[in-house]
C-alpha cells in the first residue's frame, strides 16, 4: 500500500530525542485542472490537506505552499484567465479551511513552439504531528468496518475531518486513505499492503467518482453515525456488488502501468558463477584511534548538521560542528585559520547538505569550494587524506563540493 504522506521527526540537538514531527503531502489532478482550473486548484488544496489528516494530523494546524506552472500568457485574455482561475480556486479553499499558503514557486513560461504545459497548481500541505499519532494506509486485519468521512460542503468536509481525527486520537483508526480517484481505488490500494480483502456493503455509492477531501478509514469498532461502505475480509479479494477481483491480480495490473518506465523486476540471468579468493593478508586502517574525531563545517544555508552530528555520534565518532562565520572578511579569515587547525586534529571531515550561500547563479556549493581551496585549508585536507588515511564525506550540497573540488572520483 503506497504512502500518501511523508513524515519526519524534527531535528533536535545531539543527545536529545523527540516524538514531535511533521507530516507533508501534495494534491494535484491534472485532468481536473485542464477541464476547469478553478475547480482543479480548489480540489488540489482539499486533497493535500485530506492526506495529512488521513495520516494523523489536525487540519486546524495545517499550512500550505503552492507550485504553479502555466503556458506563456502573451497578450491573450484566455491564457491569462487560466492562472487567475486556478489561484482564485486555491484562495477560496484557503479561506474555507483557514489555512494560509506560504511562499511557493511559479512559472508562466511553459510553452515551447506550439506545445503548452497543462494548467498546473500543486498544493503541498504540512502540519505538526507526534510519531505515535501517525496512521498508515494499509488494511490491518479482517473483520473491521470500513467507513467514509465526507461531506458535500466545506463545513461538512471539515466536520468529517474533525470526527475522523477524534477517532484517530482515541486509537480507533487502524488505517486510512484520502480519496483521489474514487472509493474503488482507495480500498484497492489499502488492500495491497497486507493482502487483506474487502467486501462492499453498498452498491449505491459511485465507486469510481473522484471525491476530493474524502477519507476512507478502517475502524476497530462500529461507529453508528458514520457511513460504513464495507468490511475487511480474510479472503484475498475485493468485492463490489457482483464484481470481484483477486488482490494479486490487481497488484499485477497496478504495477504493470509503469513497468516499462520504472522496472520492478529483473530478468533471470541464469546461473551466476561464484568467485572466491582467500588471502592471509588483511588491510587495516592507518588510523589507530578507537573514537575518531569528525569535523562538520557549517556554512550559511547548511540545514542538516544536527542530523549529521547525531548519526556520527551513534556510529561511535567524536563529532564536532564548526561554524563558518562570514559576516566580515576578518570573520572569514579567522574561520579559515581555526578550521585548518581543527582539521589537523581530526580524522574525518563531513560536509552536510543544504542551500549554501552563493549557490546561484551558476550552480551549487561555490562558497564551500572557495573555502576549501584556501591554501591553508587545502594543505591540511590534503595531509588528512593522503598522509593520515583520513576520510571525507559530503551530503547533498556537500557532495557537490567534493565533485567540484576534484575529490570525487579520484580523491585529489
Describe each PLM feature range.
Residues 79, 83-121, 165-295, 302-339:
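Glycine-/charge-enriched secondary-structure boundary and capping motifs
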Residues 1-155, 202, 298-300, 346-371:
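Glycine-rich phosphate/pyrophosphate-binding loop regions near the starts of catalytic domains
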Residues 311-314, 319-393, 399-410:
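Flexible gly/pro-rich beta->alpha loop and the following alpha-helix that scaffold active-site loops
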Amino acid at each position: 500500500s503506497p504512502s500518501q504522506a511523508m513524515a519526519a521527526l524534527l531535528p533536535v540537538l545531539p543527545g536529545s530525542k523527540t516524538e514531535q514531527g511533521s507530516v507533508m503531502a501534495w494534491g494535484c489532478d491534472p485532468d481536473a485542472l485542464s477541464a476547469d482550473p478553478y475547480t482543479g486548484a480548489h480540489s488540489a488544496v482539499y486533497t493535500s490537506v485530506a492526506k495529512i489528516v488521513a495520516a494523523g494530523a489536525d487540519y486546524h494546524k495545517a499550512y500550505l505552499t503552492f507550485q504553479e506552472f502555466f503556458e506563456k500568457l502573451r497578450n491573450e485574455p484566455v491564457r491569462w484567465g487560466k492562472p487567475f482561475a486556478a489561484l482564485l480556486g486555491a484562495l477560496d479553499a484557503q479561506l474555507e479551511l483557514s489555512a494560509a499558503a506560504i511562499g511557493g514557486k511559479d512559472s508562466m513560461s511553459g510553452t515551447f513552439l506550439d506545445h503548452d504545459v497543462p494548467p498546473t497548481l500543486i498544493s503541498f500541505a504540512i502540519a505538526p504531528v507526534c510519531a505515535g499519532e501517525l496512521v498508515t494506509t494499509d488494511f490491518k486485519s479482517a473483520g473491521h468496518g470500513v467507513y467514509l468521512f465526507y461531506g458535500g460542503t466545506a463545513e461538512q468536509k471539515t466536520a468529517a475531518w474533525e470526527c475522523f481525527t477524534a477517532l484517530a486520537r482515541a486509537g480507533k483508526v487502524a488505517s486510512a486513505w484520502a480519496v483521489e480517484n474514487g472509493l474503488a481505488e482507495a480500498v484497492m490500494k489499502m488492500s495491497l499492503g497486507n493482502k487483506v480483502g474487502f467486501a462492499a456493503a453498498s452498491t449505491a455509492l459511485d465507486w469510481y467518482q473522484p471525491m476530493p477531501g474524502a477519507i476512507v478509514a478502517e475502524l476497530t469498532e462500529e461507529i453508528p453515525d458514520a457511513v460504513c461502505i464495507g468490511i475487511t475480509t480474510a479472503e484475498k479479494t475485493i468485492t463490489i456488488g457482483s464484481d470481484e477481483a483477486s488482490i494479486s491480480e490487481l497488484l499485477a495490473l497496478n504495477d504493470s502501468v509503469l513497468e516499462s518506465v520504472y522496472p520492478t523486476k529483473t530478468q533471470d540471468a541464469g546461473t551466476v558463477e561464484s568467485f572466491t579468493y582467500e588471502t592471509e593478508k588483511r588491510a587495516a586502517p592507518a588510523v589507530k584511534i578507537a573514537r575518531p574525531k569528525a569535523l562538520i563545517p557549517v556554512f550559511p544555508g547548511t540545514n542538516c548538521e544536527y542530523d549529521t552530528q547525531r548519526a556520527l555520534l551513534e556510529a561511535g565518532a567524536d563529532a564536532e560542528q564548526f561554524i563558518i562565520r562570514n559576516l566580515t572578511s576578518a570573520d572569514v579569515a579567522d574561520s579559515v585559520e581555526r578550521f585548518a587547525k581543527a582539521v589537523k586534529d581530526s580524522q574525518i571531515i563531513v560536509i552536510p547538505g543544504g542551500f549554501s550561500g552563493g549557490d546561484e547563479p551558476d550552480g551549487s556549493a561555490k562558497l564551500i569550494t572557495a573555502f576549501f581551496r584556501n591554501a591553508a585549508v587545502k594543505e591540511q585536507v590534503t595531509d588528512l587524506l593522503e598522509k593520515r588515511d583520513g576520510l571525507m564525506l559530503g551530503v547533498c550540497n556537500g557532495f557537490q563540493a567534493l565533485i567540484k573540488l576534484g575529490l570525487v572520483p579520484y580523491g585529489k
